[in-house]
Amino acid sequence: MIALIQRVKRADVRVGDRTTGEIGAGLLALVCAERGDNEAAADKLLAKLLGYRVFSDAAGKMNLPVSNIDGAGGAGGLLLVSQFTLAADTNSGLRPSFTPAAPPDEGARLFDYFVAAARERHPVVETGEFGADMQVSLVNDGPVTFWLQVRP
């Protein structure tokens, strides 16, 4: 599974004229299931995402996870947005191949599992809508962006 995470001041996702999720300071994670991924891969990616230290401590070093963005136990928001294009094969030609991405039904199942697991482990979780045409807005803080990928 893949997550492209961005440290944000704020972020939101809309489907048409409806806001499906929005957060203040925290992480926006674009999430993609690849062929062969399973719940174990989702759990491993979620643990990495929740523990990844990308927020600054009092000394200005990236040393704090999203569960403690202020150094005093305050949790930041987590906005999870499905994005199958992260699995694109861009090695040949001028058109990406999405063969490496999980099929839509499996991708939806794993994304739903990932969201449910995140909600069990983190207090502020918002989402986009799987398979929808979404508009994502964010104010990137830094900018700080990381590619996280785990294999089953």
From Swiss-Prot:
- Is Membrane set as a keyword in this record? no
Reactions accelerated catalytically = glycyl-tRNA(Ala) + H2O = tRNA(Ala) + glycine + H(+); a D-aminoacyl-tRNA + H2O = a tRNA + a D-alpha-amino acid + H(+)
What positions does the record give for the motif labelled Gly-cisPro motif, important for rejection of L-amino acids? 142-143
Q: Name one GO biological process term.
A: D-amino acid catabolic process
A single cellular component GO annotation: cytoplasm
Please verify whether the record's keywords include tRNA-binding. Answer: yes
A Pfam short name: Tyr_Deacylase
Q: Where in the cell is it found?
A: Cytoplasm
State one molecular function term (GO): tRNA binding
Q: Which InterPro entries match?
A: Daa-tRNA_deacyls_DTD, DTD-like_sf
Enzyme Commission identifier(s): 3.1.1.96
Keywords, alphabetical: Cytoplasm, Hydrolase, RNA-binding, tRNA-binding
Reported function: An aminoacyl-tRNA editing enzyme that deacylates mischarged D-aminoacyl-tRNAs. Also deacylates mischarged glycyl-tRNA(Ala), protecting cells against glycine mischarging by AlaRS. Acts via tRNA-based rather than protein-based catalysis; rejects L-amino acids rather than detecting D-amino acids in the active site. By recycling D-aminoacyl-tRNA to D-amino acids and free tRNA molecules, this enzyme counteracts the toxicity associated with the formation of D-aminoacyl-tRNA entities in vivo and helps enforce protein L-homochirality.
The record's comment on protein family reads: Belongs to the DTD family.
Q: What is recorded about the protein's domains?
A: A Gly-cisPro motif from one monomer fits into the active site of the other monomer to allow specific chiral rejection of L-amino acids.
Q: How the protein assembles, per its UniProt entry? A: Homodimer.
Name of the featured protein: D-aminoacyl-tRNA deacylase
